[in-house]
């Protein structure tokens, strides 16, 4: 029982080491890897090589698949190029299996020792994250060594020998058992290594080992499908395409397993080595053969998994990819893109408010809907950022994290103000049949145009962080405040002149001027985050 526990813990250590390498590489090179994948989709050979290269770095075809899946889910990459990258990822993980199964036992303690020094010494820096990668690689090599050590006494047990002796060559049964190995161990690499060790010990025959390897590859596809079962239709299509490619490859090669085993058995290599080499060449040949069929497979997957119909018209988060949370740069970019969507909705609210001011009361209902949409997006962004490992963020990432939270909150508060403004105009002006004076309406229009311009500039500053634009936004904020004050005095002058329309709408008019001032402050606050200096007049602003 203790020996079995050692084996399970070694497999768990292998999975954990792979996770550490993936998160470390993604935190250092995540944005670059994402760029490489997104730019490689134009040509199939380039996309295939990108899948191999990225998987070699992150030590996991599942990680590469998750990246590509997020692209497809956000409509950044078409399904066919995504499937090409996934095929490349399958080859990449097989090649890394060959490299990691060389005798590198001397390298494991060295990587762990150096990695710990760098990671603990400079945890938040690039060097610290590279140290994290070193620790992960060291743990992977250590886990592989422990698996071999743990399997040896297990294979000598009579009960185990009887169980594996039942694998007498039923190719479908053997392949299913291999798939179960991969799913249970959460790693096709662990399943392949276990198969190689059992073969070297003479517990299973070479043909059975080949079936187990084929099944392990199929199991990794099933694992990806299970991981994406709750994802949207676009993401599930990628996982389905990958699984179908592996299933087709398995069905093609399984009838020839005994012939392959007989041919490979003539090579003067240890059986365990042959199992690993078969794993590499099987994936390489399968993926190269499948490359010409990615377009038909993409069409087939779209037929099987159709887009879900929109059951409601409420705006939903689109860019908050949960798989990117371990990579701060990517997660922050996703949250920023979602904040830009709030900005777009805010712009629609401003346009709707202007229509209400000009006598279209039906737009007030649309304002309420947009305010609800913005609240949904803001809540999603807030919860998404709360799930990030904030204590591991670098200083620049922490600053950006705070900027996104502040900007999304300001826009959410602004939406509440605009919704209230629309309701008050509809109730106090339109329903009561009290129109603004011509001069008053012109002034409100001028402030509206300036406010809308400031909103657009603010979103640009938020996204780009451009200092010149931030200074321009700050100056524009001051000009708006001066203009607002001037129009407030002009309204009072009209009251002195006994303008009937101004008198009837006075409280509403002055209230709108105050609300617009608050909106302007909320929109323009992003300028100070970029400039990182307080404004001398900031204390006089209304928020």
Curated annotation (Swiss-Prot):
- GO MF term set: phosphate transmembrane transporter activity; sodium:phosphate symporter activity
The membrane-spanning stretches of this chain are 1-21, 48-68, 76-96, 99-119, 134-154, 175-195, 196-216, 240-260, 274-294
GO terms of biological process kind: phosphate ion transmembrane transport; sodium-dependent phosphate transport
Q: Which Pfam families match?
A: Na_Pi_cotrans
One GO cellular component term of this record is: plasma membrane
Q: Which reaction does it catalyse?
A: phosphate(in) = phosphate(out)
Protein keywords:
Cell inner membrane, Cell membrane, Membrane, Phosphate transport, Transmembrane, Transmembrane helix, Transport
- SUPFAM superfamilies per UniProt: PhoU-like
Q: What membrane topology term does the record carry?
A: Multi-pass membrane protein
Supply the InterPro entries for this chain.
Answer: Na/Pi_transpt, NaPi_cotrn-rel/YqeW-like, PhoU-like_sf
Gene3D superfamilies with a match to the protein in the record:
Phosphate transport system protein phou homolog 2, domain 2 (1.20.58.220)
Subcellular location(s): the record lists: Cell inner membrane
Hey, which family's this protein in?
Belongs to the YjbB family.
Task: Give the function comment from the record.
Answer: Might be involved in phosphate export. Overproduction of YjbB reduces the elevated levels of polyphosphate (polyP) in a phoU mutant that accumulates 1000-fold higher levels of polyP than the wild type, suggesting that YjbB exports excess intracellular phosphate (Pi) in the phoU mutant and thus reduces the levels of polyP.
Protein name, per record = Putative inorganic phosphate export protein YjbB
Gene it is expressed from = yjbB
